[in-house]
Every structure is written in structure tokens, then in C-alpha cells.
């Protein structure tokens, strides 16, 4: 594409940010729709965050994605935060309109979209086991609760973090039963048999490591497994699900779907179906990429 003085700019801030897969994903969608937009990475050091986002607003960018380590730190620097982002306690997308910055969190939208499209899973009234209690887990737990899940159980190595997450959501979302279980105590078949879905929100699996004692064969009939990890495309958790005959999906669909939601916020347009995910898959299979 040709960049001119009329080209609208979006981007992503992080530290570091050179590894991000978001630029090829968004630029593929801009090109497919013939939109005069471009998406670029902006490396912003933590101590320069306030100056960085003020500069982006002053330069007239339409919006930007937010990645590590800024998702929480950016909250007090925004003019407005959506209720879902406030509940999650993190922002991954910012829209800039007439100099005002609005923070969104599209991670939950991405997860729910991927669960529907990849696994045909709808959370309403269902029981879900979420592995992990970090930022990704908070997004998953909140979005599942907002979508009407009947029960969401958090399993984490650190009891304090897991218990705090469950208690925080219990206080805010009365319609869902939120609970906590130490990660080392979820191997009981009777416990596992109560779940319709297992979601891994941790980095376990990226380096070939696995969860010990997790019996996926004991899940409810018709249950499924979702792993937010997308590289490698089949983690040990997903290989275990395959061996147990449990439907599964990796995190590529979620990554694309949260990007599609951000794209709609900035442009008002809907990316062609599958465009962003195809761009991600192509980049991931390029030598030297994640």
C-alpha cells in the first residue's frame, strides 16, 4: 500500500513490541478492505508510558493496541474505560476520538468468539475450569461470568492469587458461582467430571511443559479444551485432549478474534472472515517467528 498524508494510523504499544503479530494481522485486513490505514508497532518504555500515549493522541492516531507491560498501568491515564475493561482491570485496546482516549478489553470477546467458532461452545449455564490466575485468566473468568456461565473454577499454583481472583469476581458478578482450587489438587476424577470446558490461560505448554495429573478423559461427555497458547500449535495439553477424544482448539482463534474486535472499534468495518487468522498463521509458519 502507499502511505500518504491522508493515511490513518493505528498501532500497538509495548516493551518490547518488535515480536508482535498484530501488525501483519491488521494490515492484512486493511488491505483486504481497501482501507487507507496502516498499523505499526510503537516501543514505549514503562517510564515513558504517559508521554507515549499523549504523543500518539497528539499525532492523531485512530487507536492502538496495548500489550505487556502496559495493560494495567495505562488505566489511570485514559479518559474513559469501558465497564468490561474496568471489571477485568486491564486494557488491550484504546480508541482515540477528538483527543480523548477510551480503553477497551477485547480479550474476553476474542475468547468467547473462538469458543463458539472453533468448538461450538456457549458458556450459558456451563461449568468451566480456568487454569491460571494472571491477567489472561482474569479476562477469561470475567468474560465467562458476563456470558452467563453457571460455574467458573480457578485453579492456580499460588493459592492467594487464585482465591483473590475468584473472590473479586464473586463480588461483582452474582449470577455465576466462582470458586478456587489449588492446581495440585485437581487430578481427582470426580472433580474433573463436573466440567464442560477447560481453559488454559498460562504459558505452560510454550516450551513443551505440561500440567501434571490432569485427567481430561474424566471430563463431562461433550466437554472441550481451549489453550490460549498458539505456538506450538499443539501443546502437551492439547495432545492429551486429542488422545482422550476431547475436542480442542489453540489460542490462534482468540488472538484473531480480539484483533477483529479492535479493528471494528477503530474503523467501524468488519474484517473479511478468516483474513486475520490466515495472516497470523502465515506469519507463524515463517522461519524465525514465534
UniProtKB/Swiss-Prot annotation:
Enzyme Commission code: 1.1.1.25
One term under GO cellular component: cytosol
UniProt GO BP: amino acid biosynthetic process; aromatic amino acid family biosynthetic process; chorismate biosynthetic process; shikimate metabolic process
Gene3D superfamilies (alphabetical): Leucine Dehydrogenase, chain A, domain 1, NAD(P)-binding Rossmann-like Domain
Keywords noted in UniProt: Amino-acid biosynthesis, Aromatic amino acid biosynthesis, NADP, Oxidoreductase
Catalytic activity: shikimate + NADP(+) = 3-dehydroshikimate + NADPH + H(+)
Amino acids binding shikimate: 20-22, 67, 92, 107, 230
Ligand binding (NADP(+)): 132-136, 228, 251
Active site (record annotation): 71
Oligomeric and partner information: Homodimer.
Known role: Involved in the biosynthesis of the chorismate, which leads to the biosynthesis of aromatic amino acids. Catalyzes the reversible NADPH linked reduction of 3-dehydroshikimate (DHSA) to yield shikimate (SA).
Family membership: Belongs to the shikimate dehydrogenase family.
UniProt xrefs under HAMAP family: Shikimate_DH_AroE (MF_00222)
Protein name listed in UniProt: Shikimate dehydrogenase (NADP(+))
Organism of origin: Citrifermentans bemidjiense (strain ATCC BAA-1014 / DSM 16622 / JCM 12645 / Bem) (Geobacter bemidjiensis)
Classification lineage: Bacteria, Pseudomonadati, Thermodesulfobacteriota, Desulfuromonadia, Geobacterales
Gene responsible for this protein: aroE
Amino acid at each position: 500500500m502507499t502511505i500518504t498524508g491522508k493515511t490513518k494510523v493505528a498501532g500497538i504499544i509495548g516493551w518490547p513490541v518488535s515480536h508482535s503479530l498484530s501488525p501483519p494481522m491488521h494490515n492484512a485486513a486493511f488491505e483486504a478492505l481497501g482501507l487507507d490505514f496502516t498499523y505499526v508497532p510503537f516501543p514505549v518504555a514503562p517510564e515513558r508510558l504517559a508521554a507515549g500515549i499523549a504523543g500518539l493522541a497528539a499525532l492523531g492516531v485512530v487507536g492502538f493496541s496495548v500489550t505487556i507491560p502496559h495493560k494495567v498501568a495505562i488505566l489511570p491515564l485514559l479518559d474513559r474505560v469501558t465497564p468490561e475493561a474496568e471489571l477485568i482491570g486491564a486494557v488491550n485496546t484504546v480508541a482515540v476520538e477528538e483527543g480523548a482516549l477510551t480503553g477497551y478489553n477485547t480479550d474476553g470477546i476474542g475468547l468467547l468468539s473462538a469458543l463458539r467458532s472453533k468448538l461450538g461452545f456457549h458458556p450459558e449455564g456451563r461449568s468451566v475450569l480456568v487454569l491460571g490466575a494472571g491477567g489472561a485468566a482474569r479476562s477469561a473468568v470475567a468474560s465467562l461470568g458476563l456470558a452467563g456461565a453457571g460455574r467458573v473454577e480457578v485453579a492456580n499454583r499460588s493459592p492467594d492469587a487464585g482465591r483473590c481472583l475468584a473472590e473479586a469476581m464473586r463480588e461483582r458478578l452474582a449470577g455465576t458461582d466462582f470458586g478456587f482450587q489449588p492446581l495440585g489438587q485437581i487430578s481427582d476424577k470426580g472433580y474433573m467430571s463436573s466440567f464442560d470446558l477447560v481453559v488454559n490461560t498460562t504459558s505452560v505448554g510454550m516450551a513443551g511443559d505440561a500440567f501434571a495429573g490432569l485427567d481430561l478423559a474424566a471430563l463431562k461427555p461433550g466437554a472441550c479444551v481451549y489453550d490460549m497458547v498458539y505456538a506450538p500449535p499443539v501443546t502437551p495439553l492439547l495432545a492429551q485432549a486429542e488422545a482422550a477424544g476431547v475436542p480442542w482448539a489453540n489460542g490462534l482463534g482468540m488472538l484473531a478474534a480480539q484483533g477483529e474486535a479492535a479493528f471494528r472499534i477503530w474503523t467501524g468495518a468488519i474484517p473479511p472472515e478468516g483474513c486475520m487468522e490466515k495472516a497470523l498463521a502465515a506469519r507463524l509458519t515463517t522461519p524465525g517467528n514465534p
